């Protein structure tokens, strides 16, 4: 098991949820914090701690998004018309690495980011190697021909029981998909309760 995989599973235990819904996640069998005091259920969490944990869960779910990037995305969501929480999720879900992950082209958000940064993904027919590129309705994602048969991709797209969210379409044989629309919070298949209202309250203090 790689260092990244070990650390991401430890994050799930630390934050008290399975962050990516992975069956291999250690949280499924050890649903308490890591460390010698991890099973102590008497520790109380402050109001600030609850808000902070909600933010950390959401940020960790999107992989290697830095705190600065996360705050900047939130600031942009605040400036947009409409509901800040819905805008925030819409912006996070329109990132190229997130869309690659949601289309099940990669088994994890980390692998999705790597596929993008290595130039293995095409956006509207052109190589796209920046994970944070924001997609628009109608944008087409495609895996480069030269890497379509690599095991990581083939195993990911062929995994049984997977579905593509309704705001995306994906054709497995051609490994091509389309970003159809900006999703609502209720559309996003989080494996935990995304308490976006707590994140908004935290960043609005």
From Swiss-Prot:
**Domain S4 RNA-binding: from-to ranges:** 94-157
Gene Ontology CC:
small ribosomal subunit
Matches recorded under Pfam families:
Ribosomal_S4, S4
Q: Which GO terms describe its biological process?
A: ribosomal small subunit biogenesis; translation
Entry annotated with the keyword Cytoplasm? no
Give the family, as the similarity comment puts it: Belongs to the universal ribosomal protein uS4 family.
Kindly provide the name given to this protein in its UniProt entry.
Small ribosomal subunit protein uS4
Q: Which organism is it from?
A: Rickettsia massiliae (strain Mtu5)
What lineage, starting at the top, does this entry show? Bacteria, Pseudomonadati, Pseudomonadota, Alphaproteobacteria, Rickettsiales
């Amino acid at each position: 098991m790689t260092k990244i995989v070990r650390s991401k599973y430890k994050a799930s235990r630390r934050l008290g949820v399975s962050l990516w819904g992975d069956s291999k996640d250690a949280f499924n069998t050890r649903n308490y914090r890591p460390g010698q005091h991890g099973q102590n259920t008497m520790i109380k969490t402050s109001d600030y701690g609850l808000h902070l944990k909600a933010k950390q869960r959401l940020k960790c779910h999107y992989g290697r998004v830095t705190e600065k990037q996360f705050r900047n995305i939130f600031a942009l969501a605040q400036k947009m018309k409409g509901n800040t929480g819905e805008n925030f999720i819409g912006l996070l879900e329109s990132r190229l690495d997130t869309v690659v992950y949601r289309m099940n082209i990669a088994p994890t958000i980390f692998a999705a980011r790597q596929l993008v940064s290595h130039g293995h993904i095409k956006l509207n027919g052109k190589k796209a190697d920046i994970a944070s590129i924001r997609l628009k309705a109608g944008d087409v994602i495609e895996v480069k021909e030269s890497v379509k048969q690599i095991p990581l991709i083939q195993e990911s797209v062929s995994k049984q029981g997977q579905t593509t969210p309704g705001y995306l379409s994906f054709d497995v044989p051609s490994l091509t998909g389309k970003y159809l629309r900006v999703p609502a919070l209720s559309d996003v298949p989080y494996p935990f309760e995304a308490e976006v209202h707590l994140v908004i309250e935290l960043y609005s203090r």
